[in-house]
């Protein structure tokens, strides 16, 4: 069960990263255990496996939106948003994760909903998400946005 959960979380992670250059991307709520996500981020920084201070602070980091910011930065090279949609370099992930992620994306099992463009503009006028990608703020974790006209 734990392995299945980590695979699903990895797949969710794939659809949670925004292209920081275009300030747009995909969002979803992190459900279940974030162990595998924390593992990927810490492994990416080549930290010793028995030393994961990042995981100890996981909840507070998630609360501050720092975790998503770090995750987006880590995976920026693997995922990008174009005017035609989202491009994922699957070489960075296991075939099992790829399969689940593709399935989730195609069948929309993540329960994602479009974010109204008015909401984006309102958040921008309030000073949110103007200087940093919306995904980095962690404030729109329940919504999905991928508007070609936004942030280009």
Segments predicted by a language model, with ranges:
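Short, Lys/Arg-rich flexible segments
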Residues: 1-152
């Amino acid at each position: 069960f734990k392995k299945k959960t980590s695979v699903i979380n990895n797949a969710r992670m794939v659809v949670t990263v925004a292209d920081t250059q275009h300030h747009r991307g995909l969002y979803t709520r992190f459900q279940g255990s974030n162990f595998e996500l924390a593992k990927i981020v810490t492994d990416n920084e080549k930290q010793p496996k028995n030393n994961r201070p990042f995981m100890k602070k996981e909840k507070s980091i998630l609360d501050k939106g720092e975790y998503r910011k770090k995750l987006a930065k880590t995976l920026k090279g693997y995922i990008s948003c174009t005017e035609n949609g989202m491009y994922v370099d699957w070489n960075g992930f296991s075939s099992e994760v790829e399969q689940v992620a593709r399935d989730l994306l195609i069948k929309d099992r993540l329960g994602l909903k479009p974010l109204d463009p008015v909401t984006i503009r309102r958040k921008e006028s309030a000073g949110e998400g103007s200087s940093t990608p919306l995904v980095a703020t962690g404030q729109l974790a329940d919504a999905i946005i991928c508007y070609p006209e936004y942030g280009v």
